UniProtKB/Swiss-Prot annotation:
Taxonomic path: Bacteria, Pseudomonadati, Pseudomonadota, Gammaproteobacteria, Vibrionales
Pfam families: ABC_tran
Residue ranges of every copy of the ABC transporter domain listed in the record: 5-220
Name of the protein in its database record: Zinc import ATP-binding protein ZnuC
Gene: znuC
Main location (coarse class): membrane
An annotated GO BP: response to zinc ion
Subcellular compartments: Cell inner membrane
């Protein structure tokens, strides 16, 4: 598996406060990684470090040479008095011809939106257009900040299916930022639980019973999300085989003891 972006002991400090503390992680080609954590956990800062918008105070960010990173923001503020069609909005991304713009919209199931007014789009349609705009550059890494915010439950499931399909078509790495795992559970390969440092990371079914996850999100949510809920000292993969505990930074005192 090819590593496209690697963070090595990244710390970001604002004044005396460590927003990110010794964060190490990798984004691999063909993998969907979901970043979760409470508000104020440092998720937005981590995204800025990955996309190159912020330099770490200490530590290193290693990006594969020549990779392209696409970014879909959590929300987009548009001037409601400014007429703007979807196609004109897509043109703002750079010098991509009409065929490229139509191809990107087609990939997200948004061909019919080509001439629509941006202000008339539903939440789900807006997310598809933002995705299409990010796809114009054919990214190796696609970063999605709360990609289903403002979308109803049925629309959320459709978007997660679309994101999974885009990963398969483009063979890219996808990083999704989310508050929880309710619908991303079956659509992600790896979960990183962040609270300034990485509390735990691994496959979704190993995360939901992890002490650090329970401490942040509560036992009830953990039990609701767990694929398998056993009172054992081990966990299970999807085939039912025992697996070891979630990888974890023991220096923060969150081990399984």
């Amino acid at each position: 598996m090819t590593t496209l972006v690697e963070l090595q002991s990244v710390t970001v400090t604002f004044g005396d406060r460590h927003v990110l503390d010794q964060v190490s992680m990798k984004l691999e080609r063909g993998q969907i990684t979901t970043l979760i954590g409470p508000n104020g956990a440092g998720k937005s800062t981590l995204v800025k470090v990955i996309t190159g918008l912020r330099k770490p105070s200490t530590g290193h960010v290693v990006r594969q040479k020549g990779i392209r990173i696409g970014y879909v923001p959590q929300k987009l503020q548009l001037n409601s008095t400014l007429p703007l069609t979807v196609d004109r909005f897509m043109r703002l991304a750079g010098r991509y011809d009409e065929n490229a713009r139509k191809e990107a919209l087609s990939l997200v199931g948004g061909t019919h939106l080509h001439h629509s007014d941006m202000h008339s789009l539903s939440g789900g349609e807006m997310q598809r257009v933002l995705l299409a705009r990010a796809l114009l550059q054919k990214p190796d890494v696609l970063v999605l900040d709360e990609p289903v915010q403002g979308v109803d439950v049925n629309g959320q499931l459709e978007l997660y299916n679309l994101i999974q399909s885009l990963r398969d078509i483009l063979n890219c790495s996808i990083l999704m930022v989310s508050h929880d795992l309710h619908l991303v559970m079956a659509k992600t390969d790896n979960v990183i639980c962040l609270h300034h440092h990485i509390c735990c990371s691994g496959e979704p079914d190993t995360i939901t019973n992890h002490p650090s996850y329970v401490a942040l999100f509560g036992q009830q949510q953990s039990e609701q999300l767990a694929l398998y809920h056993h009172h054992h000292n081990h966990e299970h993969d999807l085939a039912g085989s025992p697996v070891g505990p979630c990888q974890h930074n023991k220096q923060h005192g969150h081990d399984n003891a």
